[in-house]
Amino acid sequence: MNRIFKVLWNAATGTFVVTSETAKSRGKKNGRRKLAVSALIGLSSIMVSADALANAGNDTGDGVTPTGTQTGGKGWIAIGTDATANTYTNVDGASAAMGYKASAMGKWSTAIGSYSQSTGDSSLALGVKSVSAGDRAIAMGASSSASGSYSMAMGVYANSSGAKSVALGYKSVASGATSSALGYQATASGDDSAAFGNGAKAIGTNSVALGSGSVAQEDNSVAVGNSTTQRQITYVAKGDINSTSTDAVTGAQIYSLSQSVADRLGGGASVNSDGTVNAPLYEVGTGIYNNVGSALSALNTSITNTEASVAGLAEDALLWDESISAFSASHTGNASKITNLAAGTLAADSTDAVNGSQLFDTNEKVDKNTADIATNTGSINQNTADITANTDSINQNTTDIAANTTSINQNTTDIATNTTNINSLSDSVTTLTDDALLWDAASGAFSAKHNGSDSKITNLAAGTLAADSTDAVNGSQLFDTNEKVDQNTADITTNTNSINQNTTDIATNTTNINNLSDSITTLTDDALLWDAASGAFSANHNGSASKITNLAAGTLAADSTDAVNGSQLFATNENVSQNTADITTNTNSINQNTTDIATNTTSINNLSDSITTLTDDALLWDAASGTFSASRSGSASKITNLAAGTLAADSTDAVNGSQLYETNQKVDQNTSAIADINTSITNLSSDNLSWNETTSSFSASHGSSTTNKITNVAAGELSEESTDAVNGSQLFETNEKVDQNTTDIAANTTNITQNSTAIENLNTSVSDINTSITGLTDNALLWDEDTGAFSANHGGSTSKITNVAAGALSEDSTDAVNGSQLYETNQKVDQNTSAIADINTSITNLGTDALSWDDEEGAFSASHGTSGTNKITNVAAGEIASDSTDAVNGSQLYETNMLISQYNESISQLAGDTSETYITENGTGVKYIRTNDNGLEGQDAYATGNGATAVGYDAVASGAGSLALGQNSSSSIEGSIALGSGSTSNRAITTGIRETSATSDGVVIGYNTTDRELLGALSLGTDGESYRQITNVADGSEAQDAVTVRQLQNAIGAVTTTPTKYYHANSTEEDSLAVGTDSLAMGAKTIVNADAGIGIGLNTLVMADAINGIAIGSNARANHANSIAMGNGSQTTRGAQTDYTAYNMDTPQNSVGEFSVGSEDGQRQITNVAAGSADTDAVNVGQLKVTDAQVSRNTQSITNLNTQVSNLDTRVTNIENGIGDIVTTGSTKYFKTNTDGADANAQGADSVAIGSGSIAAAENSVALGTNSVADEANTVSVGSSTQQRRITNVAAGVNNTDAVNVAQLKASEAGSVRYETNADGSVNYSVLNLGDGSGGTTRIGNVSAAVNDTDAVNYAQLKRSVEEANTYTDQKMGEMNSKIKGVENKMSGGIASAMAMAGLPQAYAPGANMTSIAGGTFNGESAVAIGVSMVSESGGWVYKLQGTSNSQGDYSAAIGAGFQW
């Protein structure tokens, strides 16, 4: 059931035909029931099993041989002339031979086909002259041979002689043990080898040849080409590069290696696009060299010549002295002057040499400083000592200079002698004389004069500063000295000023306050005094906290500091809860302040006795809370006799109880008024349109009716001039504001400031107390014993307490409140009173203007005044829903009317032309859908089934969900479709599974309708009466698509009957398709369109252009000829290439195809790759690592060489600097020349030219030797562009910076990987030699398994891949073999049945009847047929009925009639 077709016997044509899987072969009954019944009875009586006899051979119970022979025993089958079948004592082990001279001599063997031979036990030979000589071997195909045990040969002339080998394809050969050869003339001769592709050869043991024409000669090798034609391996993942890796490496890795070599070579070396490395360019002198050896050789020659030339130049040059790390002016062993020295730059970073005039000026300043210092010796003795030391040093320098003058005079004599010798060389040293710092015999010193003018000497290192130093000093040294001298001068001036002693005696404020003790004795008992310990006025009395009574109400204003009594804000405080948290925070601050205050108690202990009593009873300042505290003995106390405080916004008066009582009375009145308002609102809401918080709209609910006509009336506008009605939420909002007022009062509590300032000024406060304590008795807020509280009585009258800070407002607060706090409360109460009055007015107006309920109408009425009807404006859009009771506004109705107009227009467009003439001519209906019922009775379409649709004149759709389309069409089954005039769909689809069987009515074809949901049948005609073709059908692509005749024809052509042992497939997908000539397709959905192509795997594809192409693996795709795609999703992307540029190859390359193990979107590693040995072998990562290791060693060698070259360059630079101060030509003691050529010419700054005609044209360059040219900066040249020199006799380098000689370079190169050398000696970077040049090859071993996308794979990876491919292929081929075998057996049985039925004779005489029997065999299957025939009495009619059964257990029958004349 996994195909869309099957093969059935067509009785009409007498042949097998391919038809739909669900087709049936059941015909209609006819009138000759008697004949059919009798025939079937006879047929059933002689039905035989699969081991029934065939033909009329011997029937002894031992075997069957229709003209064949046997060797003895039982259970054998020999069919065909001279066919021979062996047997065995056990019937189950019998052999079978079928065909002319077929021979099955092996036990349990089978030979099918003329001259076929199966001599191996359990072997199979299938095909003309096929031979299976090995045990359990399979030979399939004409002249195929399977001589190896367990081997398989498939294809014409295929040969599998190796044990367990597989040869698949025309003339394919698998001679190696467990070898595999797949493809046209593929050969696998090595053990464990595999050859895939047309003409592929795997010769070496465990070798693999992939692709058409590939040859794998070496053991354990993989070949994707041959000696003349190679392929690229694309999409290779990067191989691991380590000491154990056997991975193949990618071109990218090789390129990276080349880049690394180029980077280390330097000299402009780079990697070309093909991976070759451009030769570096090293410039040595005037020569240019393309390799390190040549450059070093030239450099060595130049250095040797230079060293020989400069050996005697040290006599008159100002040279570097290594022992003192400075340039030395010593001449002939004595210190010498340097004359004509221009003034050096004097700066902190100057390195210029300074001349005598600059030092003289310095000395003058030093002398001046010495005089100044002498006058300040009293305060700057240390500076004087330092300056004296400097003076001594300078004096010593003067002495040293005098001594040097004597030496210079002596040197003058020596210079005169040398002048005679130098004069002979004057022509050659003219240029050097102009620029060099030379000895001036006339002055007995080195002269810095240049072109007749004094010049600077720059870059002069700092000279040693010591008593015996003869070094030249540079500008920075003198600048530093001058800086110090100037600083000393400034210091001396500063020190000259008198330093006044700024010691100030600190007076202590220790005033004895004992004289105050008598005057405060009485006051301390009853006065409200300041408590230094608490930093506040204390109401403590007799050791207990006391009240302050008779405290007049303080002024209530924003800036009021009056004290207020606790009762003023009692009611207000009950609503303030937030202050509790504030008090907690303040308490923490007070605790901290208390600790701070305690630390200061020691400074006021002398006052503790005198103010102890006073602190008990006085109303004192509390520093912790920043207020006057009425606390007494730890308890809150009243302040009595407090006059009414001023109530204003700026009042700070304390308020008394009567003031706050009045406020509370007003609050109570407001509360009562608000309650009355709420009652009025409740009564009004019964008949009024009120605001609904839930729907955010006016609700029209009234009484028990929850829905009425008008809802969602917006809230009234709240403004000064608004007369709109307000809802409960608006009034609720007003109440919320009243509550917010209370919260705002709490928010007015200010932060309590720290008492640090008060603590710091404690002494000042004590002094103030001493001054004002006399009058404190009269004016203090004292304790009143009668009232048990502090009294604000003053002069017999109640008084205000002003400047009272705002008290804390909380439930447990005992702070006095000031007038501003009470004023703010009263202001808010007044505001509430006004707001409530406004609310009452609004409610009154609401009764007049509100949209109210009308009991008579049973609805809300928009009537207003005398006007009966009015508009309701500003109505929000009502909700449009089935359960909506909202009022709709005009815009909504307008939108509805517009939609109705649009619908009318749309209906007109849909209806089309409705004129009677148009309908008569074109039929009734709507636009684009019409039925012409002219001349017909007036019938309609009838869709009586639930969800059914009927379209057409008298169309009837009675089945649920059915469709009847067309005149008189009918669909009566649920989900059925009747399509076309007169079509009837009245047969339900049966859900279930039924096997194909023979019944009294004929053969019934099986079906399976349980795998998917059945929606109904589509009918295009009527049962037994009419039908239609479905034309122009596209090819089906999915399992349930309809197929075309073309697809059936292709499917028939793709059916194969060749069985395959060791090949199996387990899939429910579509079958494979081998379209190309000599192609092979294995695996579900696999399609091979190319000639000689091979496709193995699920959904594998070989394109028509990919001749000889191979695709192995699920979804693998071979797009190009002679190319291979191996692995899931692998694709070939380029195929064969001609004249392409390969990496590191100069010569254009050709390839016959491509081997791909991945795709552009995904690559694979080829792992377990053996180390390659031949030129075209793949290399693994291990081989690359060996190369990389050698490159690393070479790189290190090159680095060492570069270091040595750098050191040589340093030496040359040092020599060059020395030469700059010495005569470049002529002779000295150790320097001689023998030439009459042109003078040397040092043109560049700081350049040196040594040798006749030598030219140092560039800055800091050196030209060594006759005619040498140094025309580039910072270079040493020992020749010119046309004439080069070697640097010979170079000793072997030892240190990192030593020069190396050719012997060392050769030794270094001996073990390294080298590039090929061109005929001219240059490096050919397109070829990398791995051997010693003797002609042998080198294998890159230890290639790690590839990991990255572009790694090369090693042999192990490739071997494993091939093994996995083989395993997969074997599995799929085995699965396919099983399927093919089953199909073959079924078809062979059917063909045998057809042959048997065709062999039935029939009656021919008029009135005669005949019963006949016949047998048939085909391809190992047999069948028997019986038939009944008769001829009518007139002889005109002939009737036949026949049935057959074959060895596959299939039964079939046929009936026919004919008329003859």
Curated annotation (Swiss-Prot):
One of its GO terms (biological process) is protein transport. GO terms for cellular component: cell outer membrane; cell surface. Disruption phenotype: In vitro, loss of sadA does not affect cell aggregation, biofilm formation and adhesion to epithelial cells. Disruption does not affect the course of infection. Residues 1-54 form the signal peptide. Keywords: Cell outer membrane, Membrane, Protein transport, Signal, Transmembrane, Transmembrane beta strand, Transport. Gene3D superfamilies: 1.20.5.170, 1.20.5.2280, 2.60.40.4050, 4.10.80.270, 6.10.250.2040, GSPII I/J protein-like, Serralysin-like metalloprotease, C-terminal. The keyword Transmembrane applies. The chain crosses the membrane at residues 1407-1417, 1421-1431, 1440-1446, 1450-1461. The keyword Transport applies. It comes from the Bacteria. Immunization of mice with folded, full-length, purified SadA elicits an IgG response which provides limited protection against bacterial challenge. Homotrimer. The signal peptide, cleaved at the inner membrane, guides the autotransporter protein to the periplasmic space. Then, insertion of the C-terminal translocator domain in the outer membrane forms a hydrophilic pore for the translocation of the passenger domain to the bacterial cell surface. The surface exposed region contains four YadA-like head domains and extended stalk regions, multiply segmented by FGG, HANS, DALL and neck motifs. This is Autotransporter adhesin SadA. The lineage of its organism: Bacteria, Pseudomonadati, Pseudomonadota, Gammaproteobacteria, Enterobacterales. The gene is sadA.
